[in-house]
Amino acid sequence: GKSILSHIDKYYEAPSFIDRVIVTHPDGDHAGGLRIVLEQLEVGELWMNRPWLYAEELIDRFSRFKSVDNLRSRLREIYPNINELEKIAQKKGVPIYEPFQGSIIGVFTILAPSKSRYLDLIVESEKTPESAKEESATQASSFGSLIESLAEKAVSFIRSFWGDEAFSDQETSAENEMSVIQYAYICGKRILLTGDAGRGALGEAAGYANVANLVLPGIDRFQVPHHGSRRNVSTELLDIWLGSKLADKPNEGEELFTAIISAAKKDDDHPRKAVVRAMIHRGGKVVTTQNGGHRTGFDAPEREGWVAAAPLEYPEEQED
């Protein structure tokens, strides 16, 4: 959160007012840092989905809960980051809106999630078991996920031919699938922000694209979901959004789009090589935030202290 404030102060002349803040999903690495932003700046609108608002609609789907109030309280406990954001917003009188499919936020259109799918994801989440039996299954699933995560950290690499893409057969979390997917057409560029969206979210968003006057394939600036994880994309979905694989790697300067991956410098596990390969297979120039922040612009002035990002090289190998 402090780094966000520092960036805003330095490059946007320290404004005291922010028009809109959008919370993509409830995970701490996305929602946690926004507390200080809401506390220290005046915010016009907060866009954030809150599971407890729908406790009355969901109560029949949770056999362990008989009281709507108890379910509402439990959902607040499960998602503490957005619960705290709500408290701050209400204290400061900031209106909170729901970023569901079809919502318009400035120049952006929300492509996913729909409300119905969001409610399904709340029920499906490993954090919200419906019964004692399902809780046991959830614990087993969580243990399995831990083992899979450890296995991914110890993953080996295989040399692969051009066009080969080895994605994980595991799915991402329900919370990641809740991610708000935003589309905008700015300065002739088609921009897609995905948060940590998984395959289900990307599929739902693609199904709504034509309503937002977005003809697929065709994205100019693609924020690769979930730090470049193999669990969030597939060959079929990338074909829908970005187009089919090319016969050869495009020459430098002739790329068809820019893929931007948010990944921490100390994160040795992301982005995954398979995902970087997939972007380049479709003509993408791939850049990451591992060596600092990244901005993309069009006909904009130079920013002091910033230099052109060096695109990632094509990985000749990928995760086994």
Name every feature range the model reports, one short phrase each.
Residues 39-190, 280-320:
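Flexible, acidic/histidine-containing loops and adjacent segments that form or flank the divalent-metal
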Residues 200, 207-212, 216, 236-258, ...:
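C-terminal regulatory/interaction regions
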Residues 18-29, 222-226:
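Metallo-beta-lactamase
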Residues 182-233:
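Long, well-ordered mid-to-C-terminal structural blocks that present hydrophobic/aromatic surfaces
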Residues 26, 50-51, 113-115, 195-197, ...:
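Active-site metal-binding loops of divalent metal-dependent hydrolases
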Residues 1-15, 175-200:
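Conserved beta-strand hairpin/beta-sheet module of binuclear metal-dependent hydrolase folds
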Residues 31-40, 234-238, 273:
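Metal-dependent catalytic neighborhoods of phosphoester/phosphodiester hydrolases
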Residues 1-21, 36, 122-126, 200-214:
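Pre-active-site segment of Zn-dependent metallo-hydrolases
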